[in-house]
Amino acid sequence: KYGSSKIPAKDTSFIKNNFDGEVQKGGRSEALRIIESFLKIRVQSYLFNLSAPGKSEKFCSRISSHLTWGTISMKELLKLVEDRKVNLSAEEAKSWKRNLTAFTSRLSWRCHFIQKIEDKPSIEYKCMHSFYESLRENVFNKDYFIAWKEGRTGYPFVDACMRSLNYNGWITFRMRAMIVSFASYDLWLDWRKTGYHLAQTFTDYEPGIHYSQLQMQSGVT
């Protein structure tokens, strides 16, 4: 993990074979560099740009892949955030503290969903609400699925997000929710198949977060 030059390595068997994009750098030193950059500079615009697909790549923390691959721990990260709060100047505290608190709440949210799959691992392959089993899987359209994966649905915003994700291995949370809900409701694709593809694509794939959100955005909870 610590010696990796990319997150994850392009030859990782779990990653789709035709990956040809450019993912963020990995490694311990890179994890420390980007969190320092976030806490000292970028966090001041965190909430304002959190959901913007064009700006989130810069203003989000971008630490999620490092948490996934273990180049920084949650305990260490929380300590760095709390230290930053304590050392804010009076001027910084006016706006920065709110952004830091929002970031901390999302770290707590991450832990919550990881615990959720620990308590109920079946959510990886079973609908949380059993009534919705067989809702979509029996009418799966392979052509729709391929077009969605490749960013060729004909819906410009959806396709742009998918192509960006395929290239970078990362996209902001709101856009993840959008591409999943589009696949589930507009294309009527089963969440298990779209979810597996996304799990192969996200460099910060974390099963607990992934499957809980996938099911909620597909309306099977």
State where each predicted segment sits.
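C-terminal, helix-dominated tail/subdomain
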Residues: 132, 136-139, 186, 197-221
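Glycine/tryptophan-enriched, flexible segments
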Residues: 1-130
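Short acidic alpha-helical/loop segments enriched in Asp/Glu that coordinate divalent cations
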Residues: 118-130, 190-198, 210-213
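Trp/Phe/Arg-rich N-terminal binding region typifying the photolyase-homology
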Residues: 1, 89, 163, 209-213
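Short, well-ordered loop/turn and helix-capping segments at boundaries between secondary-structure elements
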Residues: 83, 109, 167, 184-189, ...
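A contiguous catalytic/ligand-binding core that recognizes phosphate-bearing ligands
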Residues: 108, 113-167, 171, 178
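Short acidic (Asp/Glu) and glycine-rich catalytic loops that position anionic groups and cofactors
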Residues: 14, 56-59, 78, 136-142, ...
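Contiguous, well-ordered alpha-helical segments that form the cores/surfaces of helical PPI scaffolds
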Residues: 61-64, 102, 143-146, 156-166, ...
